[in-house]
From Swiss-Prot:
Its main location: cytoplasm. One of its GO terms (cellular component) is cytoplasm. One of its GO terms (biological process) is regulation of DNA-templated transcription. The gene is rsd. Binds RpoD and negatively regulates RpoD-mediated transcription activation by preventing the interaction between the primary sigma factor RpoD with the catalytic core of the RNA polymerase and with promoter DNA. May be involved in replacement of the RNA polymerase sigma subunit from RpoD to RpoS during the transition from exponential growth to the stationary phase. Keywords: Cytoplasm, Transcription, Transcription regulation. Belongs to the Rsd/AlgQ family. It is found in: Cytoplasm. Interacts with RpoD. This is Regulator of sigma D.
Amino acid sequence: MLNRLESLTQRVGGSNELIDQWLHARKELLVSYCTVIGIKPQKEKHTPLNAKTLENFCHNLVDYLSSGHFHLYDRIIKEVEGASSPKMALTAKIHPALKNNTQTIMAFHDCYTNIEIDDDSCTEYQQALSDIGEALDARFRLEDQLIQWAAESWQAAQLADADKKSQVN
């Protein structure tokens, strides 16, 4: 997921401040996920379970979900083409899948926030972490469709503006 994020950032990073903020928030979430599962990016050594890292991950998870649902998705579409855009259909198509995905992710959050993981629950917890990783991957693939579309739209608008300016001159 980090590699795919890096590739996406190289393709669309710098095209718009909203996208840059979104990608930065995703990176923070992924780093906290890697930390909570015991992987240190760019290192081979696993780290033991730490309640503080789980708390940090759950906090980043809620922040990320909230910013997407209540800030980024529709704002990006409206900023690109306006509220009456036919491209709002893209969000209408993706939104139900994101909503279902959010419910899955929030179930993890609700289950593992303020809970102590002991030897008896460790296997279940490890499976839940694997499941949440798959849910995040699915979510990022959906969001990538929005990000790619927005970046392409902004680039096309910039080219159109440049053409207009060159025709005037």
